[in-house]
Amino acid sequence: MGSMKKSIQWSAVVILGVTACTPALKLTPSDADVVLARQILEAPDPGQPGSFRVQRLYYGSGTDKNRSEYRDSVAITTPTVDVSKMVSLGASASERNDYWDFTPKEMPLNARVWYPDGEGPFPLVLVVHGNHDMRDFSDPGYDYFGELLASRGYILVSVDENFINGGIRGENDARGWFLLRHVQLFEEFNAEAGNPFEGKVDMSNIVLMGHSRGGEAVANAAAFNNLTHYPDDASLKFDFGYDIKGVISIAPVDGQYLPTGRPVVIEDMSYLTFHGSHDGDVTSFHGLRIYDRMKFNDPDTFNFKSAVYVYRANHGQWNSVWGSHDSGPRSARILDLRGLIPEEDQRRFAEIYVSAFLEVVTRGDKSYLPIFRDHRVIGEWLPETMYITRFETSAFQPLANFEEDIDVTSGSEHGVTIAGDSLATWKEANLLLRSSNRANTSASQDNQGVTVGWNNRMAGPDTTVHGPTARYTLGLPAGLAADWRLSAGSTLDFMLAPTNDVPGPRKAPTSEDDEEEEEDNEDDETDAAGRGGDDDEEEEDPDVDLSIELLDSSGRMARVTLSEYGAVRRPLDTYVMRRGDREAARFQTHWEMILQTYSIPLRDFLADNRSLDVRQITQISFVFDQVHAGEVIIDQVGFSDLDPGFLGARVEGN
């Protein structure tokens, strides 16, 4: 298992569509033909319609000035609400009040509903849009979710919040509060004799879904659900406490609402977030921050979180009204739209993941869990693009998350030590986001990781001379593996991603003169980007791969190769703007640094060495033996006692 494996073909860019006035389109070549080559999961496709006939209705004020469906077509008339403590219209108040014919003291509870024709009770799913032109109504844009999910036995409610769209700020707390107020309506509908939803709503199975600002709003709602008072004005009392089982954030913002100056934390439920690389509006994956802050307080209660980065997806195509125009009507002049995946493919991905998430979270159908551990098991279902995925369960126990102190030799769990051998780079640092337009909300992932770089070649004209193989090792205290009850069914989990940097060859000075000569050689062999080169090679930097090694207290070792457990990719090239100067001004880099989760069953190490005692593991090593040089970022190293469902389908070879 020590031989070099190269399953991912790498090239810097694909150059397409060069004309006199349009710059070349730059995309990382797709590896979908390899990564998505198999269909292992045998469960039914969750993105296909179910057996229920779909019914539709509107509810609302019945007096809407601008929208006939909420004026003339409401099946249920609902009250107005006072959100003036949360919504300030500022200088636009007069214009907005004239347009809508109401103020924040009397805003409506409007929504369109898709629901199954059946007895029920059915799980309740609410979706809320984000910010957009308030006159270009956003709530119809999730019709594709409505049709699919209602046919599969869910009540899908698309909430109207267009009246707080447009040019106002500081309203994302209200967006979340509105969602809970709509949940309260369904509690009333469910109990009301003669109501179309009488007895049909499963109030013990609620999921909140939001897009853009709505993606942060659902996190706010999940937090508000457990509070008795509004954090920013305790005179406003809350009385919710609903059984919210999961939250879904689609291309969310984060940090627009900071109650008492602190970010919102979701606790003890399941979470799904996804984001497109070519998002021209929310230009960084802010859902990763919500994901990282999420807390599982009870390891014995099953919950999980999942994040997916979809290459070449944009912001607006998650909504059928918004489409490809992430920067408004003039998007084609501002954004480079040529690299986007088709909108039907983008929504097909969303249908699969959202539906599978709902099946797991509301119905306990764990046959879909493998999708979240390793997307490669559904290669035939997924649109042909590249995906970077993360997942973690409530059963994860961290050894090192690189958050607790400034000592690079200590782990997060007491007694865990860290050591490096023959490394060119070893540092812990905050991970950045590519967007630089807001320093407090857009520049950082708010998450630490460790950067490890290596070059096993020795400096000099003979490129066949190598030093000791570089490695990065976590040492476990005696008894920890036994205390954690590690077994063949446990998994070693971590996040990792290569960077674009490649250190130069190692120096091995034997004297002052030799040291100067080595430095001269290194200067000759390192290009302007800091990448090591070889005199006799013209090829691109090799694909990154490495080995993962376990050692027990008796010195028995087992090793697997990382690429067997998922693609190991350098950052994916992302150019959103048509003009290079605008791209450079808006973004720190032309890629987003997204770490991939790798989940390796300990039984795979036992397959390499049956004598390994997993109850006596003392070391975990990242061994850089597959390519001579590279650099990776590592985070969240630990063990999980996964629900067996996660391993119910696995790509052959891992």
Each model region followed by its residue ranges:
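Extracellular ligand-binding interfaces
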Residues: T463-N609, D625-G648
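Hydrolases whose catalytic domains are alpha/beta-hydrolase-1, hotdog thioesterase
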Residues: A217-A221, V282
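Active-site-adjacent alpha-helix of alpha/beta-hydrolase-fold enzymes
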Residues: V265-E343
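Short conserved active-site loop signatures built around small residues
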Residues: L25-G120
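Gly/Ser-rich "nucleophile elbow"/oxyanion-hole loop immediately N-terminal to the catalytic nucleophile
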Residues: G118-G120, G170-E216, F224
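Short beta-strand element of the alpha/beta-hydrolase
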Residues: P121-G130
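Alpha/beta-hydrolase-fold serine-hydrolase catalytic core, especially in secreted/extracellular enzymes
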Residues: L25-D31, Q39-P44, Y311-H315, V321-G479, ...
